[in-house]
Amino acid sequence: MKGLLLKDAYQAWYYAKMVVVAAVVMMGVGVISMMNGANFFIVYAGFLLGMMPMTLLAYDQTSKFNEYSAALPATKEQLVGCKYIVGLCGLVLAEAFAAAALGVAQLHWVAVDSALVISTLVQVGMTTLLSSTILLPLSYRFGYEKAKVGFYFIVGALSALMGFSVAANEDGLVRNLLPQSISSLGLLSIAVVVLTLYALSWRLSVAWYGRAEQ
C-alpha cells in the first residue's frame, strides 16, 4: 500500500503540477471576486484539484499498470483505495488553499463574513470530491476514454449553474453554487452526504475494478 501511494505521489508531482498552479491562480482571482461575495473561482479551483485521481488513473490505464498490478501483493481495495486517498489529499490541499484565499479576502472585503467563509469551504469540499465520486467508478467500469463523457457533463453542469447565477444577479456576477440562506445544519448535512457518497463510490469502484480491461 505504501509503495502504491509513493507511486501515485510521484506521478502527481510529475504530471499534475500545472493543475496545482492553475488552482492557485484561480484562488488568486477568487480573492478579487470575493469583494462582491462571489466565490465561484475559489470553488472551481477545488474542482480542478479534485481531478488528480482521474489523471493518475488515466496514466495507469494507458500504461497497462492495472494489468501489471495483478502480480503485486495488493488487493483490489488497496489498488482502488490509493486513488481515493489521493482524492482526499486533493481535498485537504483545496481546503488549505481556499482557507488562505478566504483569509486574505476577509481582511480586505466587507462582504466576506464568517457565514460566507464556512459556506465556501463546504462548497470547495463538495466540488473537489464530486468528480472522483462520479468519474472513478465509471473509469473502472468503462475505461477513462468513455468516462471523459461524464467529465464533460460535470463541466457543463457547473457552467449551467454559473449561467443561472449570473442571470439571478443584476450585476451579472457569479456568486455561490449554493443558496446563501442555507443554514449551518444544512451545510453540515451536505458535507456528510458528500463524504458518504465518496465512500460508496469507493465500494462501487472496487466492485467494478478490472471490468474496463475485459
Task: Annotate the PLM regions.
Residues 70-76:
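Short helix-to-coil transition segments within interhelical loops
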Residues 1-64, 82-214:
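Hydrophobic alpha-helical transmembrane segments of membrane proteins
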